[in-house]
């Protein structure tokens, strides 16, 4: 007898998504630090080598100069923001799916899943942008040799003192440009892979842990293929001195292409791809397990 479809619960998505986000940050932050440092390093002078020659070089130099804590620099900001951010992300996805269903039995098409995923990206931008701004500033300050901020709270306090609440939301448009299409790809790919990995006659809810890990990991890779160019622009814009880019992302884009070519839009690609699989596998395992527990404890919630 087929299992009766359950109505999508945005509340369960909220709770399980928060835990999944914590798992993602803890596993993925070291290579996120490497990614941001590669994306924001200045062009090298003629005849001089760049500060970092690549992902492994940046990882090695950070570990040697700052220890393991250097790789986790700025993690407090995303940890503080990640529970509500991923909770809202999965809530937005659940809501997006529910809005397109006439009944719980309706199966959504992949374009509909993409649309629901894009809604989740809109939902998360308000939480994501301040955390990304603080995280990026803390991640690059050690490599630049200027320790302006002693930590997350100090950075938040000084940003507010200097720029007011708007200082936290520098880069909002670029965060939207990154997260809306990337979130659509993020969730659509995951649902497609789950369906692909589900044996005939079985439910996607019965997927084994290894298959959940593989589906979550590859979803992260597809997500970042879409997200890297706007992420490079966002990192550069959010860490730039005030007034450097008066026309926003257009100035950043022109400068990058003029000075470093189109390939500069994929700075940090190796770090992102190495990070994407384990971090997102951990995220979706961290989401699926609490969701199963919640469905067992409160099936009608």
From Swiss-Prot:
PROSITE patterns: SOLCAR (PS50920)
Domain of life: Eukaryota
Catalytic activity: O-acetyl-(R)-carnitine(in) + (R)-carnitine(out) = O-acetyl-(R)-carnitine(out) + (R)-carnitine(in); an O-acyl-(R)-carnitine(in) + (R)-carnitine(out) = an O-acyl-(R)-carnitine(out) + (R)-carnitine(in); O-propanoyl-(R)-carnitine(in) + (R)-carnitine(out) = O-propanoyl-(R)-carnitine(out) + (R)-carnitine(in); O-hexadecanoyl-(R)-carnitine(in) + (R)-carnitine(out) = O-hexadecanoyl-(R)-carnitine(out) + (R)-carnitine(in)
Subcellular localization, as worded in the UniProt entry: Mitochondrion inner membrane
Residue list for modification N6-acetyllysine: 148, 157, 170
GO MF assignments: carnitine:O-acyl-L-carnitine antiporter activity; O-acyl-L-carnitine transmembrane transporter activity
Membrane-spanning parts: 13-31, 74-93, 113-131, 171-190, 212-230, 268-287
UniProt repeat feature Solcar, residue ranges: 8-99, 108-196, 207-293
Main location: mitochondrion
GO biological process terms held by the UniProt record: carnitine transmembrane transport; in utero embryonic development; lipid transport; mitochondrial transport
Modified residues (N-acetylalanine): 2
Membrane topology: Multi-pass membrane protein
Gene3D superfamilies: Mitochondrial carrier domain
A Pfam cross-reference name: Mito_carr
Keyword Membrane attached: yes
Residue positions, PTM N6-succinyllysine: 170
Mitochondrial matrix side: 32-73, 132-170, 231-267
Keyword Transmembrane in annotation: yes
Cytoplasmic side: 2-12, 94-112, 191-211, 288-301
Post-translational modification remark: The N-terminus is blocked.
Keywords: Acetylation, Lipid transport, Membrane, Mitochondrion, Mitochondrion inner membrane, Repeat, Transmembrane, Transmembrane helix, Transport
GO cellular component labels: mitochondrial envelope; mitochondrial inner membrane
Physiological role: Mediates the electroneutral exchange of acylcarnitines (O-acyl-(R)-carnitine or L-acylcarnitine) of different acyl chain lengths (ranging from O-acetyl-(R)-carnitine to long-chain O-acyl-(R)-carnitines) with free carnitine ((R)-carnitine or L-carnitine) across the mitochondrial inner membrane, via a ping-pong mechanism. Key player in the mitochondrial oxidation pathway, it translocates the fatty acids in the form of acylcarnitines into the mitochondrial matrix, where the carnitine palmitoyltransferase 2 (CPT-2) activates them to undergo fatty acid beta-oxidation.
PANTHER family referenced in this protein's UniProt entry, alphabetically: MITOCHONDRIAL BASIC AMINO ACIDS TRANSPORTER-RELATED, MITOCHONDRIAL CARNITINE_ACYLCARNITINE CARRIER PROTEIN
Protein name stated in the entry: Mitochondrial carnitine/acylcarnitine carrier protein
UniProt source species: Rattus norvegicus (Rat)
Classification of source organism: Eukaryota, Metazoa, Chordata, Craniata, Vertebrata
């Amino acid at each position: 007898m087929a299992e009766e479809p359950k109505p999508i619960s945005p509340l369960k998505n909220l709770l399980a998504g928060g835990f999944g986000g914590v798992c993602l940050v803890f596993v993925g932050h070291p290579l996120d630090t490497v990614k941001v440092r590669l994306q924001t390093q200045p062009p090298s002078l003629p005849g001089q080598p760049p500060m970092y020659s690549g992902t492994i070089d940046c990882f090695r130099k950070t570990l040697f100069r700052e220890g393991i804590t250097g790789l986790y620099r700025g993690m407090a900001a995303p940890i503080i923001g990640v529970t509500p951010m991923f909770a809202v992300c999965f809530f937005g996805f659940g809501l997006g799916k529910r809005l397109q269903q006439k009944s719980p039995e309706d199966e959504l098409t992949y374009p509909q899943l993409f649309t629901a995923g894009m809604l989740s990206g809109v939902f998360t931008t308000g939480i994501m942008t301040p955390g990304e701004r603080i995280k990026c500033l803390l991640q690059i300050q050690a490599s630049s040799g200027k320790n302006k901020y002693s930590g997350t709270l100090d950075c938040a306090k000084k940003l507010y003192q200097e720029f007011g609440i708007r200082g936290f939301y520098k880069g909002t448009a670029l965060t939207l440009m990154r997260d809306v299409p990337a979130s659509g790809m993020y969730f659509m790919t995951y649902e497609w892979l789950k369906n692909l990995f589900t044996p005939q006659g079985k439910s996607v809810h019965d997927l084994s842990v290894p298959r959940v890990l593989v589906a979550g990991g590859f979803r992260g890779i597809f997500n970042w293929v879409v997200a890297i160019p706007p992420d490079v622009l966002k990192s550069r814009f959010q860490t730039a001195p005030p007034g450097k880019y008066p026309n926003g992302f257009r100035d950043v884009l022109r400068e990058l292409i003029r000075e470093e070519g189109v390939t500069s839009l994929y700075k940090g690609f190796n770090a992102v791809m190495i990070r994407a699989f384990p971090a997102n596998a951990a995220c979706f395992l961290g989401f699926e397990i609490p969701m199963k527990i919640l469905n067992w404890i409160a099936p009608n919630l």
